[in-house]
């Protein structure tokens, strides 16, 4: 498993809004912070940090990437 600390997502422990609070959020989708959008744009750069063909001893090769 590969750990990328820059991809951490903070999840609130608060419950979903009650019916009387429904007007506080846009309908359909929750608002996405700008930082999350910026991280998605930076993702291809992070995927190219390891030069192709660089297989150090003890380092597993990554054969697939999962977009976040």
UniProtKB/Swiss-Prot annotation:
Signal peptide segment: none
Pfam families: Alveol-reg_P311 (PF11092)
GO biological process: axon regeneration; regulation of neuron differentiation; regulation of transforming growth factor beta receptor signaling pathway
Compartment(s): Cytoplasm
GO cellular component: a single term: cytoplasm
Keywords: Cytoplasm, Phosphoprotein
Disulphide bridges, residue numbers: none
Transmembrane segments: none
PTM notes: Phosphorylated on Ser-59. Phosphorylation decreases stability and activity.
Top-level taxon of origin: Eukaryota
Subunit comment: Interacts with FLNA. Interacts with the latency-associated peptides (LAP) of TGFB1 and TGFB2; the interaction results in a decrease in TGFB autoinduction.
Protein function: May have roles in neural function. Ectopic expression promotes axonal regeneration. Also augments motility of gliomas. May also have roles in cellular differentiation. Induces differentiation of fibroblast into myofibroblast and myofibroblast ameboid migration. Increases retinoic-acid regulation of lipid-droplet biogenesis. Down-regulates the expression of TGFB1 and TGFB2 but not of TGFB3. May play a role in the regulation of alveolar generation.
Protein's name in the database: Neuronal regeneration-related protein
Organism of provenance: Rattus norvegicus (Rat)
Source taxonomy: Eukaryota, Metazoa, Chordata, Craniata, Vertebrata
Gene name as annotated: Nrep
